[in-house]
UniProtKB/Swiss-Prot annotation:
Short sequence motif named LPXY motif, residue ranges: 186-189
Species of provenance: Mus musculus (Mouse)
Protein name: Transmembrane gamma-carboxyglutamic acid protein 4
Source organism phylogeny: Eukaryota, Metazoa, Chordata, Craniata, Vertebrata
Motif (PPXY motif) on chain: 204-207
Modified residues (4-carboxyglutamate): E72
Domain Gla, chain residue ranges per copy: 52-98
Protein modification: Gamma-carboxyglutamate residues are formed by vitamin K dependent carboxylation. These residues are essential for the binding of calcium.
Membrane topology of this protein: Single-pass type I membrane protein
Cytoplasmic domain ranges by topology: 135-226
Length: 226
């Protein structure tokens, strides 16, 4: 009596489980017949957005199962286009419709987005190059504005050790005559002293009135007689 009660209690669960199994078998059997999609589904497929492969050039690189069906959801038409064979497509779709895009190996494996990593590295390199060029330009402008210390030191040395006027006594000038003045065409010390004496002696001022002891003769201009 007790086993009969147990069987009767399990009848609702059996009635709920059997239609689900029958429906899944019917879907798997009629999957190859659903090759042609409707107009709305085709438009949705043509205007679909890229998910994980948005950085890849999908128009130029051929698609594969890992990128089209494991990284994102794919349809039966996409799988058939990649595999190119009806038998392989049916086998793949039977397992793919049950497991879905994620597999056991993909769950344990950490995926690295290579394209995002490369994009970040390229952007960082471009910014480093731009900052380097800006720093080089700033250094050039600062160096142009700042005077060179070597040129200022040379100027102070020449100004300090080569005076424009050299004072000498007459004895030193006689004992050690300079050749630089002769080469430059400048007068010697004796010539300079003679010139200064000649120009410094001024003539006496003239006295007013006629000079004493001298007669002043006036010359008259007359026309000759005919």
């Amino acid at each position: 009596m007790f086993p009969l009660l147990i069987v009767l209690s399990q009848l609702p669960r059996l009635t709920l489980a059997v239609p689900h199994c029958i429906r899944s078998l019917k879907d798997s059997e009629h999957a190859p017949e659903e090759v042609f999609a409707s107009k709305e589904a085709a438009n949705i497929f043509m205007h679909r957005r890229l998910l994980n492969n948005r950085f890849d050039l999908e128009l130029f690189t051929p698609g594969d199962l890992e990128r089209e069906c494991y990284e994102e959801f794919c349809s039966y038409e996409e799988a058939r286009e990649i595999l190119g064979d009806d038998e392989n497509t049916i086998k793949f779709w039977q397992t793919y419709s049950i497991k879905g895009p994620t597999t056991g190996s993909d769950v344990n494996k950490e995926k690295i987005d290579v394209m995002s990593l490369l994009t970040g590295l390229i952007v960082a390199g471009v910014f480093l190059v731009i900052f380097g060029l800006v720093g080089y330009y700033v250094c050039l402008t600062k160096c142009k504005r700042r005077p060179y210390p070597s040129s200022s030191a040379n100027y102070t040395r020449t100004a300090r050790y080569t005076p424009s006027i050299v004072f000498r006594s007459p004895e030193e000038a006689v004992l050690s005559p300079s050749t630089s003045s002769e080469d430059a065409g400048l007068p010697s010390y004796e010539q300079a002293v003679a010139l200064t004496r000649k120009h410094s002696v001024s003539p006496p001022p003239p006295y007013p009135g006629p000079a004493r002891g001298f007669r002043v003769f006036k010359k008259s201009m007359s026309l000759p007689s005919h």
